[in-house]
């Protein structure tokens, strides 16, 4: 009876699993003093794993018949390189952008793939560690999908924006880029008054375009992964309800079927979202090289 009395409701379960491990309690929607420690740590660990895997592949690479892992890496590298060549026509820029695109794809794929782990696996382990340290395990928060954190995805998209601005200035020159800001997309006029009006309108449109690209770039990845995380939580609740209810005979069956179907579908989602983010980054960087 005591266990049932303290069992969380469905809403409490979801709210608990959507809480981040943070350095301080967040008091407002936008608070730059808050650091989501779980997203940072998991992201860094996965990044280190990706680097180690590529280093290991490069170390064991052979010019003869490649092994399965080397063949998979070669296919991935060739795919990214082809996409980079299709969007970035400056060979010098591709020396940096192509490896960057490969890194972005693999890193985001690994962060997305954390959603395939059982919902309660790592949070339960963290709760045990947190409780063993003398803290209340009910306040042990941990989210293991960094890309389901808006801070992560907007951080990545902002980094792409910074690179776009850098290449715009590098390729076109500071004067050429500034001229583009006030002459595209509506052009200019020989009349000074109309030229001023068009310049202001063009500048506002350029700012809106940069902001819209950056926000939508990050929000697209976040929205898909956040929704996927919620669906997995709802499926986990089906299993929990089945464990606590003798009358819900079909709940375990529904739990297994729904979980299996969504997991198979989600493999496509996590791969596709990593590819889309990489492709948009390449497209935006390619546009930064072109004159409008």
Swiss-Prot record:
SUPFAM superfamilies: F1F0 ATP synthase subunit A. The keyword Chloroplast does not apply. Its main location: membrane. It is found in: Cell inner membrane. CDD domains: ATP-synt_Fo_a_6. PROSITE patterns: ATPASE_A. The chain crosses the membrane at residues 37-57, 96-116, 144-164, 192-212, 230-250, 263-283. GO terms for cellular component: plasma membrane; proton-transporting ATP synthase complex. Coiled coil: none annotated. F-type ATPases have 2 components, CF(1) - the catalytic core - and CF(0) - the membrane proton channel. CF(1) has five subunits: alpha(3), beta(3), gamma(1), delta(1), epsilon(1). CF(0) has three main subunits: a(1), b(2) and c(9-12). The alpha and beta chains form an alternating ring which encloses part of the gamma chain. CF(1) is attached to CF(0) by a central stalk formed by the gamma and epsilon chains, while a peripheral stalk is formed by the delta and b chains. Belongs to the ATPase A chain family. This is ATP synthase subunit a. It comes from Paracidovorax citrulli (strain AAC00-1).
């Amino acid at each position: 009876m005591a266990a049932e009395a303290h069992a969380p409701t469905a809403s409490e379960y979801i709210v608990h699993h959507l809480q981040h491990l943070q350095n301080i309690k967040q008091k407002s929607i936008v608070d730059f003093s808050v650091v989501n420690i779980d997203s940072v740590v998991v992201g860094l660990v996965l990044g280190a794993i990706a680097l180690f895997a590529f280093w290991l592949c490069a170390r064991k690479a052979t010019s003869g018949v490649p092994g399965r892992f080397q063949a998979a890496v070669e296919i991935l590298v060739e795919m990214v390189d082809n996409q980079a060549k299709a969007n970035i026509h400056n060979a010098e820029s591709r020396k940096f952008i192509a490896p960057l695109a490969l890194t972005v794809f693999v890193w985001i794929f690994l962060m997305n793939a954390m959603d395939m782990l059982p919902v309660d696996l790592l949070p339960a382990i963290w709760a045990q560690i947190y409780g063993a340290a003398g803290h209340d395990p009910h306040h042990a928060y941990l989210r293991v999908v960094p890309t389901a954190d808006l801070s992560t995805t907007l951080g990545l998209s902002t980094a792409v924006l910074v690179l776009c601005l850098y290449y715009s200035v590098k390729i076109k020159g500071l004067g050429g880029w500034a001229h583009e800001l006030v002459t595209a997309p509506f052009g200019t006029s020989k009349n000074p008054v109309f030229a001023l009006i068009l310049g202001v309108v063009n500048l506002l449109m350029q700012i809106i375009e940069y902001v819209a690209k950056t926000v939508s770039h990050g929000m697209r990845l976040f929205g898909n992964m956040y929704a996927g995380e919620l669906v997995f939580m709802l499926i986990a609740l089906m299993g929990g309800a089945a464990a606590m209810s003798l009358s819900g005979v079909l709940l375990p069956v529904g739990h297994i079927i729904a979980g299996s179907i969504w997991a198979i579908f989600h493999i496509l989602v996590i791969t596709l979202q990593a590819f889309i983010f990489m492709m948009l980054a390449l497209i935006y960087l390619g546009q930064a090289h072109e004159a409008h």
